[in-house]
């Protein structure tokens, strides 16, 4: 597994790099924090670990840049205790968030869970689903409606796939959380809310935001 670790604290970087390499992860770091995207594009990571507080530009800036060109999973690290940092990271398309200090074994468990979730279908052939008058491409994380195409994050696509495969049925929040993360204890309820909100915002670009309905106190439903 190729990990790009964007961390300016060299002591922490070296400690994490050593721990991750013991699990056979190939870890790259950043030499010039003004050129993070250069390393990102040349290294082609399978997962990015991104610190919030960085020199020159913060992690949110680099997350936006990465999302312009890739759906690679991004896990944020932050020493700040502001809950809005977590909300912002989810809104920008991050897949997970950890606050410093943290247990390294928890980080490794999260990385392994993300990897399984995102890459378990990479060897499969193209898979598509028809939803209303749109075509959902599960292999490309995209939705095409007429001449318009939108792209989802891996997390958003998993949520949508669950809802579409149970069209016109209420899917509980717990069911979705269980499918997204291996250990529910590591997930806040707000994280799912943010991801669904972001999914609806993208669907609005192709006039499909009303296709997913919130059932208060129960969960969500995708209309056929």
Curated annotation (Swiss-Prot):
<keyword id="KW-0046">Antibiotic resistance</keyword>
<feature type="DNA-binding region" description="OmpR/PhoB-type">
    <location>
        <begin position="126"/>
        <end position="224"/>
    </location>
</feature>
<keyword id="KW-0843">Virulence</keyword>
<keyword id="KW-0804">Transcription</keyword>
<dbReference type="GO" id="GO:0005829">
    <property type="term" value="C:cytosol"/>
</dbReference>
<dbReference type="Pfam" id="PF00072">
    <property type="entry name" value="Response_reg"/>
</dbReference>
<dbReference type="GO" id="GO:0046677">
    <property type="term" value="P:response to antibiotic"/>
</dbReference>
<dbReference type="GO" id="GO:0006355">
    <property type="term" value="P:regulation of DNA-templated transcription"/>
</dbReference>
<dbReference type="InterPro" id="IPR001867">
    <property type="entry name" value="OmpR/PhoB-type_DNA-bd"/>
</dbReference>
<feature type="modified residue" description="Phosphothreonine">
    <location>
        <position position="149"/>
    </location>
</feature>
<dbReference type="GO" id="GO:0032993">
    <property type="term" value="C:protein-DNA complex"/>
</dbReference>
<dbReference type="GO" id="GO:0000156">
    <property type="term" value="F:phosphorelay response regulator activity"/>
</dbReference>
<comment type="subunit">
    <text>Interacts with GraX.</text>
</comment>
<dbReference type="InterPro" id="IPR039420">
    <property type="entry name" value="WalR-like"/>
</dbReference>
<feature type="domain" description="Response regulatory">
    <location>
        <begin position="2"/>
        <end position="115"/>
    </location>
</feature>
<dbReference type="InterPro" id="IPR036388">
    <property type="entry name" value="WH-like_DNA-bd_sf"/>
</dbReference>
<dbReference type="InterPro" id="IPR001789">
    <property type="entry name" value="Sig_transdc_resp-reg_receiver"/>
</dbReference>
<protein>
    <recommendedName>
        <fullName>Response regulator protein GraR</fullName>
    </recommendedName>
</protein>
<feature type="modified residue" description="Phosphothreonine">
    <location>
        <position position="128"/>
    </location>
</feature>
<keyword id="KW-0238">DNA-binding</keyword>
<keyword id="KW-0963">Cytoplasm</keyword>
<feature type="modified residue" description="4-aspartylphosphate">
    <location>
        <position position="51"/>
    </location>
</feature>
<keyword id="KW-0805">Transcription regulation</keyword>
<dbReference type="InterPro" id="IPR016032">
    <property type="entry name" value="Sig_transdc_resp-reg_C-effctor"/>
</dbReference>
<keyword id="KW-0010">Activator</keyword>
<keyword id="KW-0902">Two-component regulatory system</keyword>
<keyword id="KW-0678">Repressor</keyword>
<dbReference type="Pfam" id="PF00486">
    <property type="entry name" value="Trans_reg_C"/>
</dbReference>
<dbReference type="InterPro" id="IPR011006">
    <property type="entry name" value="CheY-like_superfamily"/>
</dbReference>
<comment type="function">
    <text>Member of the two-component regulatory system GraR/GraS involved in resistance against cationic antimicrobial peptides (CAMPs). Upon phosphorylation by GraS, functions as a transcription regulator by direct binding to promoter regions of target genes such as adhesins, exoproteins, transporters, toxins, and proteins involved in cell wall synthesis. Down-regulates the expression of many genes involved in RNA and amino acid synthesis or glycolysis.</text>
</comment>
<feature type="modified residue" description="Phosphothreonine">
    <location>
        <position position="130"/>
    </location>
</feature>
<dbReference type="GO" id="GO:0000976">
    <property type="term" value="F:transcription cis-regulatory region binding"/>
</dbReference>
<keyword id="KW-0597">Phosphoprotein</keyword>
